[in-house]
Curated annotation (Swiss-Prot):
Database matches in SUPFAM superfamilies: Glucocorticoid receptor-like (DNA-binding domain)
Keywords: Metal-binding, Ribonucleoprotein, Ribosomal protein, RNA-binding, rRNA-binding, Zinc
Descriptive protein name: Small ribosomal subunit protein uS14
Organism of provenance: Aquifex aeolicus (strain VF5)
GO annotation terms (biological process): translation
Length: 62
């Protein structure tokens, strides 16, 4: 729980320059591998997609 509280606190902080702002996953707080279109990291995206929580997203097969 402390990690989520820290992420929430960091999101309230406005950096001195806009370029310093880092996109973070609102679910787990991960700063890397962020997918802007879905506003979550790749790991959370995969979990939600496999569960069927994201409409129109399906596993690719060819």
């Amino acid at each position: 729980m402390p990690r989520k509280a820290k992420v929430a606190k960091d999101l309230m902080y406005y950096p001195k320059w806009k370029s310093r702002k880092k996109n973070r996953c609102p679910i787990c707080g991960r700063p890397r591998a962020f997918i802007r279109y879905f506003n979550m990291c790749r790991i959370c995206f995969r979990e939600h997609a496999l569960r069927g929580d994201l409409p129109g997203v399906r596993k690719a097969s060819w």
